[in-house]
Amino acid sequence: MSLFDTINAGGAQLLGFAWPTVWAVVRILVVSVVILLCVAYLILWERKLIGWMHVRLGPNRVGPGGLLQPIADVLKLLLKEVIQPTAASRWLYLIAPIMTVVPAFAVWAVIPFQAEAVLANVNAGLLYAMAISSIGVYAVILAGWASNSKYAFLGAMRAAAQMVSYEISMGFALVLVLMTAGSLNLSEIVGSQQHGFFAGHGVNFLSWNWLPLLPAFVVYFISGIAETNRHPFDVVEGESEIVAGHMIDYSGMAFALFFLAEYINMIVISALAATLFLGGWDAPFEFLSFIPGIFWLVLKVFALLSVFIWVRATFPRFRYDQIMRLGWKVFLPVTVIWVVVVGCWMMSPLNIWVK
């Protein structure tokens, strides 16, 4: 019996019919707190890693080795005043940052951390993740419009066009995973990657989706960078043009919510990439299967987040027309062609996804 089953059984005996509600709330709170801590130290890791790439130390003054820097940053933002522009639409202005961060948290309901460890093991988990993550576009448009500022609205329009453009390519990449796994359930998608010739010989990582679906994996991950408005796709908040884009009129904790949503979405994109293409909680080699699955998932997510940061430190920002061209003229045709290729592959005698 797993730890989760033990806690569940003990709680059911103790609290009776009220236990399912209490257990659901406890799990949601635990996941939310862990995500907030991950965001805090992801920001520190980003500053440290970019510092090393620039041949400097990065934050190292607050606490031993700078470990308390995230706490200082949070306190600074909490203590700053939220200044609302006079011409802004009051309630819409305040709702926008909340609408940005809520979907970022909500996606975690269906992401499995290891076998049987998921908040909601729904059969349409992949569809749910795609639908919920799309809501962030409305929050960005709302923030730009409610601020009643030309620069904020321009940034919001850029963000909306960019996010919608790359969602199409990302959607086709996920269709490929659906085709090969035959399921929208994320746990079953992970399970479908644990079979095949290489997995039978103990080399699990060669059975994961990243290899046969490599173009889709690359398109998905780069589209994820564009979806989160990260460098080199950050024309939404281009410092040399419109500064912070749709967030330009936000300050204090309202601005911090946008910042929080961006980093949570980075972790979500990495967690989904690890789940759909890198075997989720599966160990890369069979002889390492004794290590808990959540360790492998965290390691894969950390590696993908480090790639996010490496891309930021390495590449120059694209022009807006280059971003649109990449999305519509490169990624979309590549994913459509690969859908056809994989469809023919699955219908041929060389089908490697035979159930």
Curated annotation (Swiss-Prot):
Principal location: membrane
Keyword set, alphabetical order: Cell inner membrane, Cell membrane, Membrane, NAD, Quinone, Translocase, Transmembrane, Transmembrane helix, Ubiquinone
Protein's membrane topology: Multi-pass membrane protein
GO cellular component, one term: plasma membrane
Keyword Cytoplasm on entry: no
TM spans (from-to): 25-45, 91-111, 126-146, 170-190, 205-225, 253-273, 290-310, 330-350
Example GO BP: aerobic respiration
Broadest EC class assigned to this enzyme: translocase
Pfam families linked: NADHdh
PROSITE patterns per the UniProt record, alphabetical: COMPLEX1_ND1_2
Superkingdom of origin: Bacteria
Residues annotated as signal peptide: none
Recorded catalytic activity of this chain's protein: a quinone + NADH + 5 H(+)(in) = a quinol + NAD(+) + 4 H(+)(out)
InterPro entries in UniProt: NADH_UbQ_OxRdtase_su1/FPO, NADH_UbQ_OxRdtase_su1_CS
E.C. no: 7.1.1.-
Intracellular or extracellular location(s): Cell inner membrane
A molecular-function term among this protein's GO annotations: oxidoreductase activity, acting on NAD(P)H, quinone or similar compound as acceptor
Entry function: NDH-1 shuttles electrons from NADH, via FMN and iron-sulfur (Fe-S) centers, to quinones in the respiratory chain. The immediate electron acceptor for the enzyme in this species is believed to be ubiquinone. Couples the redox reaction to proton translocation (for every two electrons transferred, four hydrogen ions are translocated across the cytoplasmic membrane), and thus conserves the redox energy in a proton gradient. This subunit may bind ubiquinone.
Quaternary state and interactors: NDH-1 is composed of 14 different subunits. Subunits NuoA, H, J, K, L, M, N constitute the membrane sector of the complex.
Alphabetical list of PANTHER family matching this protein: NADH DEHYDROGENASE SUBUNIT 1, NADH-UBIQUINONE OXIDOREDUCTASE CHAIN 1
Family note: Belongs to the complex I subunit 1 family.
Name assigned to this protein: NADH-quinone oxidoreductase subunit H
Source organism of the structure: Burkholderia cenocepacia (strain ATCC BAA-245 / DSM 16553 / LMG 16656 / NCTC 13227 / J2315 / CF5610) (Burkholderia cepacia (strain J2315))
